[in-house]
Design a protein with these regions (language model features):
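A generic "functional-site adjacency" signal
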Residues: 16, 102-106, 190, 230
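Class I S-adenosyl-L-methionine
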Residues: 3-8, 97, 115-328
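SAM cofactor-binding core of SAM-dependent methyltransferases
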Residues: 2, 6-100, 251, 268-272, ...
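N-terminal start-of-chain detector that recognizes signal peptides
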Residues: 35-38, 111, 206-210
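Long alpha-helical, hydrophobic tracts
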Residues: 47, 64-154
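Sequence-level motif detector for i,i+2 pairs with an aromatic at +2
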Residues: 35-38, 103, 134, 231
Length: 328
């Protein structure tokens, strides 16, 4: 059973901010391509939050939602917010190979609620080997170190975090320089990022070896956030090698404050604020934040919130979710 039965995907503040940031990044595609011709592939579950956002804001009219749980098929069909969404039943490893990603530009977001596994690597291979230049691929996964405290598959009586992480990633993929490293939360994030990007670049290298058209994958996203559990999101654009610089400039991708092209993460941290606090802060934003953390606004510096909380909000106020209870 997926996490949809435990968490309302529409009510996770940090996830909501992530979706809006990604949407803003994707909007830059319109400077090089017609976004309405793209296909969006995701894991919509029963909420379809990303589908609603991307259809309304990007004008994407062809959308595919992959659902592996047959028990919620009727519920997913009922909850589809738009007729342009096609529900494909099955695991991502069986559905993705049958999508014609080689025939059209695509945006693919594999938003897993599980930890890293062979499925993740299989999907990376399928998508990156097929998708066309100027397409976007991103994946999110559970990056909580609690996963490392699960019993080993080969011996259910043993709990060994070092062996567990090798088991999850696969011995052949596990980088040697991480083998003797204690798996702290930070090291685990670095390991996951390294393995994901290594797999993507390996597929790109194989693809270039078999085709005259040479491509590259340019990472633009490396988010972490916490809505109950720590999640990691890594992604970027596939370009023709000769187009990459020009297209990144036209799309203004690198000017976004949350753009990340390395293992350095962007932490999405929504402070919990009252409606009155939000309204007051908004009336004084945007503002300059100095190197010492001070804000270039007397009102904000005297506001009854910590400087850290105000700076967190100032960094993402344009994406901050608004929740309102209504009686229908």
């Amino acid at each position: 059973m997926g996490s949809y039965d435990k968490i309302n995907y529409l009510l996770r503040p940090n996830k909501s901010v992530e979706r809006k940031m990604v949407c803003e990044m994707l909007s830059g595609i319109s400077n090089i391509r017609n976004l309405s011709t793209y296909i969006y592939v995701g894991l919509g579950s029963v909420y379809f939050a990303d589908f609603m956002l991307f259809h309304r804001n990007l004008g994407i009219k062809k959308m595919v939602s992959i659902e592996s749980d047959n028990k919620v098929k009727e519920r997913c069909e009922f909850n589809k917010p738009f007729s342009c969404i096609e529900l494909k039943m099955g695991d991502s490893t069986s559905v993705l190979p049958n999508l014609n990603l080689q025939d059209t530009n695509s945006i693919v977001w594999m938003d897993y609620d599980s930890a890293i596994s062979d499925t993740v690597f299989s999907d990376i291979n399928t998508v990156v080997s097929k998708m066309t230049p100027d397409s976007f691929f991103m994946l999110s996964l559970n990056a909580d170190t609690i996963n490392l405290k699960e019993p080993l598959e080969e011996d259910k009586d043993i709990i060994d975090p070092q062996r567990k992480v090798v088991e999850m990633i696969g011995d052949e993929r596990f980088p040697n320089h991480f083998r003797d490293v204690e798996m702290t939360a930070k090291q685990y994030l670095n390991l996951l990022h390294h393995c994901i990007m290594t797999e993507i670049n390996t597929v790109v290298q194989k693809r270039n070896g078999m085709n005259d058209e040479k491509v590259l994958f340019h990472q633009t996203v490396n988010f972490i956030y916490l809505d109950g559990i720590r999640m990691l999101t890594v992604g970027g654009f596939l370009f023709k090698q000769e187009d990459a610089e020009e297209h990144l400039e036209k799309m203004c991708t690198r000017s976004l404050p949350f753009y990340r092209n390395s293992e350095e993460v962007y932490k999405i941290q929504c402070p919990i604020l009252s409606l009155k606090e939000i309204q007051a802060l908004n009336s004084h934003l945007p503002c300059i934040v100095h190197d010492d953390g001070k804000l270039d606004d007397e009102f904000l510096n005297s506001f009854p919130l910590s400087n850290q909380e105000i700076r967190k909000y100032a960094a993402l106020y344009r994406y901050y979710p608004n929740y309102v209870e209504t009686l229908l």
